[in-house]
A protein has these predicted regions:
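Active-site loop segments of alpha/beta catalytic cores
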Residues: 1-41, 45-49, 127, 136-414
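Residue-level detector of functionally special positions within alpha-helical transmembrane segments
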Residues: 2, 70, 92-95, 264
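Short, surface-exposed loop and linker segments with low hydrophobicity and enrichment for Pro/Ser/Thr
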Residues: 10-17, 66-67, 107-110
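Segments that shape or occlude catalytic/ligand-binding pockets
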Residues: 32-84
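Short, charge-rich binding segments
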Residues: 64-68, 96-98, 105-108, 188-193
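Ordered hydrophobic segments in well-structured contexts
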Residues: 73, 115-117, 197
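A contiguous, low-structure linker/loop signature
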Residues: 78, 82-168
Length: 414
């Protein structure tokens, strides 16, 4: 089987020749650049480290590393990593070197950390000394009281770190004809040059989109106490996504196998909102967005949603979601056996292969291998599983554990 065939078979709930593997095909299955530098030293690999996601400090895995670990999927944004003028040098928080996208401009904060400003000077992201991520520092619609204040989402999103510091191809609008043509050309080149499956990030966040714009607590208050205001913002988000979806798939739809949607619905112990509130406010809008995706795309719909979301999975299946990530198995109700038993016929699992909050960070290589074998035994039965760790590999994960994890994934149950 080719890598692409392996992924398609698994997501179609068929057992491939081995469980497919992902390292860095989207921004929650990757490795932090600090950890990646350590891994390269451990393996004797040379070359620059490219931190393509500046917010989360994620590295683009080199081809030699993808080959070494048997990776079967790549990120569409990889198509934008081949031109030297797309990159510039920048020191990581531990002082080790990296390259970052040329369109992102962190500046020293004068206290040993970094910040990023919008065009008008507003600080939209900060990374204090000793911290390994940029935090969102501005919720541009936090003080809005009327729906009319939601009209210009583009201006608001220019002050949201996640969109203002976006990864390719979202660093420029697809409404720009030159950028659209460039995205199309690069996507075709990437498709022709690999037999790996390709994932393209689209987003479509509803709950999270409201939280980015209004503030996490404020938007939850809106849903409970100001529902008309919350619905007005969510409807405006849906409108913007419906404008983007046809353009995105016209550019890359025939070059990708999986489209990555996103909406963090959970916490460590429960969903952020009750099932009743989800079904009233979020589900109808998710459904509209995912139906629009399906109208333009014949591949797999993948949803990244952190946390304890088991009670919402039946709704996600009903909406048309086919793949869930990161499968945060340490959260309440997210036990692998339960997830596979109750939802494995209709939902594929992309993640859950090794606990980043536990054994991957603090265990021994043999403990890592043991957990990987256990997870493949549960999630991999009958297909419906792409192996990757739970969310990103953190800066303090020992490189020997990373190697042990991917070697065990390649070996499977043998």
């Amino acid at each position: 089987m080719t890598s692409r065939e392996r992924v398609v078979a698994a997501l179609s709930h068929q057992e491939p020749d081995r469980v497919p593997i992902d390292l860095g095909a989207m921004r929650s299955t990757g490795i932090m650049a600090i950890a990646y530098n350590k891994l390269k030293r451990h393996l004797g690999a040379a070359g620059d480290t490219r931190a393509y996601d500046v917010v989360q400090q994620l590295a683009e895995p080199d081809e030699c590393i993808l080959d070494r670990f048997g990776a079967d999927v790549v990120d569409l944004s990889r198509a934008f990593f081949d031109r030297p003028d797309d990159w510039k040098p920048w020191p990581l928080p531990d002082g080790s070197p990296a390259l970052i996208p040329a369109w992102v401009d962190p500046e020293p904060d004068g206290r040993g950390g970094w910040l990023v400003r919008a065009a008008d000077g507003t600080v939209i992201a900060d990374m204090p000394a000793g911290v390994h991520y940029f935090h969102q520092a501005c919720h541009p619609l936090e003080d809005a009281t009327e729906p009319r204040e939601f009209a210009d989402l583009a201006a608001a999103n220019a002050k949201v770190s996640w969109s203002a510091m976006a990864c390719a191809p979202w660093h420029r609008p697809l409404t720009n004809p030159e950028h659209f043509a460039d995205v199309r050309e690069r996507a075709l080149k990437l498709r022709a040059g690999t037999d790996r499956a390709i994932m393209g990030a689209l987003g479509g966040n509803i709950l999270e989109g409201g939280q980015f714009l209004r503030g996490f607590g404020t938007f939850l208050e809106d849903l409970a106490a100001r529902p008309a205001l919350a619905e007005a913002l969510m409807d405006r988000l849906v409108e913007s996504y419906l404008e983007t979806i046809p353009r995105f798939f016209a550019a890359v739809g025939d070059c990708i196998d999986v489209v990555q949607m996103g909406d963090d619905l959970g916490t460590q112990t429960a969903a952020q909102v009750s099932p009743a509130m989800y079904r009233r406010f979020i589900k109808p809008r998710h459904t509209v967005v995912y139906e629009a995706v399906r109208k333009h795309f014949g591949g797999f719909i993948f949803l990244h949603s952190c946390g304890a979301i088991a009670e919402l999975i039946p709704d996600l299946i009903d909406e048309g979601v086919q793949v869930i990530n990161p499968v945060q198995t340490s959260c309440v109700g997210m036990e692998p056996e339960r997830l596979k038993r109750e939802f494995g016929r209709d939902m594929a699992f992309w993640g859950g292969g090794c606990e980043t909050q536990g054994v991957l960070r603090a265990g021994t290589p043999e403990q890592v291998r043991e957990q990987v074998r256990e997870r493949i035994g549960v999630f991999g039965a009958g297909g419906g599983f792409v192996f990757t760790q739970v969310h990103n590999i953190m800066a303090d994960v020992p490189p020997a554990n990373v190697v042990a994890m991917f070697e065990a994934a390649q070996a499977g149950l043998s």
